[in-house]
UniProtKB/Swiss-Prot annotation:
Annotated protein name in UniProt: Large ribosomal subunit protein bL32
HAMAP family: Ribosomal_bL32 (MF_00340)
Domain of life: Bacteria
Similarity section: Belongs to the bacterial ribosomal protein bL32 family.
Residue stretches of biased makeup (Basic residues): 7-16
InterPro entries in the cross-refs: Ribosomal_bL32, Ribosomal_bL32_bact, Ribosomal_zn-bd
Gene Ontology annotations for the cellular component aspect, listed alphabetically: large ribosomal subunit
Organism: Aeromonas salmonicida (strain A449)
KW rRNA processing (keyword) present: no
Protein keywords: Ribonucleoprotein, Ribosomal protein
One function term, GO molecular function aspect: structural constituent of ribosome
Chain segments carrying region Disordered: 1-21
GO biological process: translation
Length: 55
């Protein structure tokens, strides 16, 4: 098993963890239905950029 040779400092631990933060998904309100959906995705009722794309 891998065992560290030397203890890592709080600063090094923080540097490693600096990229671990999660970001929330970008949400948009649909022009037609006013529904909230993810950017560049079709809404649940089939609208994309104000047009019905799924019947």
């Amino acid at each position: 098993m891998a065992v560290q040779q030397n203890r890592k400092t709080r600063a090094k631990r923080g540097m490693r963890r600096s990229h671990d933060a999660l970001t929330s998904a970008a949400l948009t309100v649909d022009q037609t239905s006013g529904e909230i959906h993810r950017r560049h995705h079709v809404t649940a009722d089939g609208f994309y950029r104000g047009k019905k794309v799924i019947a």
